[in-house]
A protein has these predicted regions:
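Charge-biased low-complexity segments
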Residues: 311-442
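Acidic/His- and Gly-rich active-site-bordering loop/insert found
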Residues: 45, 71, 89-134
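Alpha-helical metal-binding/catalytic segments enriched in His/Glu/Asp
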Residues: 104, 120-126, 130-185, 300
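His/Asp/Glu-rich mid-to-C-terminal helical/loop segments that flank catalytic regions of hydrolases
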Residues: 276-325
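Metal-dependent peptidase/peptidase-like ectodomains
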Residues: 179-272
C-alpha cells in the first residue's frame, strides 16, 4: 500500500507524538525499569484474556491494539493507527480470516540514506487454544505463549523505545513491525512485503525477534547464511557486550525472517531457541529470564545501531551455506514452473498420507509424557528427486522432532521440480502432526 510509504516519507521531516498513561508495575522493587516494563508487557500479552493470540482472534486484535498503544507511549510514531493495518487471508473453506500488522517508524538523520530502512519485527500471534481428550472428555487448554512470542514483542517495544530516544545516532530509518498471522506461514510479513510497503527495494536488512526468554539454554543468531551479516555479528561480539549470541548455520525455527530472505533482503534471526514448554499451557511468564532478556536487548540494540550506520549488507551466502547448496539455486516449491511430484501428485498432502503417516511412529516416551503438536519440517528435493537436508523449522519436542525428520528424510525419490524446462533443487516445508488422544481406562 503506497499510503504507508507516503506516510513514512512525510515523517522523515517531522514527529508529533501522543502519550498514554500506563499503570506502574508492583513488586520486584529491585529490578530495572526496563525489566519491569517487559514483565508488565508479557503479563498482558500472555494473559488468559487474550487466549493465546490465535491469528484472526479477538485476542490477536487486542494484542495489536496493546502494542500500538505501547509504542505510542514510548514516543514512537505508529503508522497503522490504534488497530493496526488489517489484511485478509483466504482459508481452505472459502472464509476470509482477518489479521493485523502493527507498523511504526523511527527516522534516520542522514539525508543520503534516510530513505533506506532497517526492519525490526516480531510475530504477534501464536496457536491460541488446543483440545485434549481426557477420560473421554474434551478439555480446552490455552497456550499462553509467554516465551512464544510475548517475550519478543516486549523486547520489540523496549528496542523501539531505545532507538527512538537515540535516533540522532541512526543514519538509516527504522521500521518497527509486529506481524499478524505469522503462524500461518508468515502471512503478515508476506503481506507487508508484497502488498503494503512499496519501497521494498530500499529495505537494507531485517532483524527478527522470536522466543527470547530462555537464554540460560542458549542465545542464538541465525544470519540466514549471509556473509556480511555474519561479519557484522562477529565484529560486534568482539567488543564488550553483556551477552553474546552463538551464531548458528542452521535455521532454529520458522519465523517472519523467511519472507524477507525470500525477497533477498539480508536477515538475522535472534532467538533463545526451542524449549520444553513450547506451544503448551506451561508457556507462562514464570519461565522467562528477564535479566537475561535485558542483556539480549542491549546486544540487539547495539547490533541495530551498527546496521543503521554501517555499509549496506549484500545478499550473499557465506561459505558454509554455499557449500551446502554447492552453488546451486534453490527454488521454493510453489515457485517451480513444474512442481515436484510424489507418486504422481503435486499435492504435498499425498506425501504426508502415503508416506509420512504410513511410517510415522509415535515415540512411546512422548505418549507417556503427553507430548503432542505439529512439527514444521523443511527439506530439499534435488535435481534427481532425492530428499536431502531434512530439518526442523518449528519444533514441538526433541522426541517428536527427531521422528518427523527421520521419516521425511527416508522418503523415496520424487519427480523433481522444473524451472524453464530444467530440473532444479526445490525447497518444501510442511507440518507433520502428532495427535495424542487419552482414552478412558476400562
Amino acid at each position: 500500500m503506497k499510503r504507508l510509504f507516503t506516510i513514512v516519507c512525510l515523517l522523515l521531516a517531522t514527529l508529533t507524538l501522543p502519550a498514554q498513561y500506563r499503570r506502574p508495575p508492583y513488586g520486584d522493587l529491585y529490578e530495572s525499569v526496563t525489566v519491569a516494563a517487559m514483565r508488565e508487557d508479557v503479563r498482558f500479552l500472555a494473559s488468559a484474556a487474550l487466549e493465546g493470540r490465535k491469528a484472526g482472534s479477538e485476542g490477536e486484535r487486542e494484542a495489536a491494539r496493546y502494542v500500538s498503544s505501547r509504542l505510542e507511549e514510548e514516543g514512537v510514531d505508529v503508522l497503522t493507527g490504534p488497530q493496526g493495518e488489517p489484511f485478509g487471508i483466504r482459508q481452505e473453506n472459502g472464509d476470509t480470516l482477518s489479521s493485523h500488522n502493527v507498523l511504526a517508524f523511527i527516522p534516520g538523520y542522514d539525508k543520503s540514506v534516510a530513505d533506506h530502512y532497517i526492519v525490526i519485527g516480531a510475530r504477534l500471534d501464536n496457536i491460541g487454544t488446543y483440545e485434549l481428550t481426557i477420560d473421554g472428555e474434551k478439555v480446552t487448554r490455552i497456550c499462553y505463549d509467554a516465551n512464544g512470542n510475548a517475550s519478543g514483542l516486549a523486547m520489540l517495544i523496549q528496542l523501539a523505545s531505545m532507538l527512538q530516544r537515540n535516533k540522532v545516532l541512526l543514519r538509516r530509518s527504522v521500521i518497527i513491525a509486529a506481524f499478524g498471522a505469522s503462524c500461518m506461514l508468515g502471512a503478515g510479513s508476506w503481506y507487508f512485503l508484497n502488498r503494503s510497503f512499496s519501497a521494498v527495494d530500499k529495505i537494507d536488512a531485517m532483524i527478527n525477534l522470536d522466543m527470547l526468554g530462555t537464554a540460560s539454554s542458549g542465545f542464538y543468531a541465525w544470519p540466514s547464511g549471509n556473509a556480511d551479516l555474519t561479519q557484522f555479528l562477529s565484529n560486534l561480539s568482539a567488543t564488550l557486550q553483556p551477552i553474546v549470541p552463538q551464531v548458528v548455520t542452521r535455521e532454529p525455527c520458522f519465523s517472519d525472517h523467511k519472507a524477507f530472505y525470500d525477497k533477498e533482503i539480508p536477515s538475522v534471526f535472534f532467538t533463545t531457541g526451542m524449549y520444553p514448554e513450547y506451544n503448551s499451557e506451561k508457556d507462562t511468564e514464570s519461565i522467562l529470564e528477564y535479566d537475561n532478556m535485558e542483556r539480549e536487548l542491549e546486544y540487539i540494540y547495539n547490533f541495530a545501531v551498527q546496521l543503521c550506520c554501517g555499509p549496506r549488507p549484500l545478499f550473499k551466502l557465506d561459505e558454509a551455506t554455499a557449500a551446502r547448496l554447492n552453488g546451486k539455486m534453490v527454488v521454493p516449491y510453489y515457485e517451480c514452473d513444474v512442481k515436484p511430484t510424489f507418486l504422481g501428485s503435486t499435492d504435498p498432502g499425498v506425501f504426508l498420507q502415503k508416506w509420512v503417516y504410513a511410517y510415522l511412529h509415535y515415540p512411546a516416551e512422548a505418549v507417556r509424557q503427553g507430548i503432542h503438536g505439529r512439527v514444521l519440517v523443511d527439506f530439499l528435493i534435488d535435481e534427481k528427486g532425492n530428499v536431502k537436508d531434512a530439518h526442523v523449522l518449528k519444533g514441538v519436542h526433541p522426541l517428536l522432532d527427531e521422528e518427523a525428520v527421520k521419516v521425511v528424510g527416508a522418503s523415496p525419490r520424487w519427480k523433481p521440480g522444473k524451472v524453464r524446462g530444467k530440473p532444479v533443487i526445490s525447497e518444501v516445508s510442511l507440518y507433520v502432526e502428532f495427535i495424542l488422544e487419552r482414552r478412558k481406562n476400562r
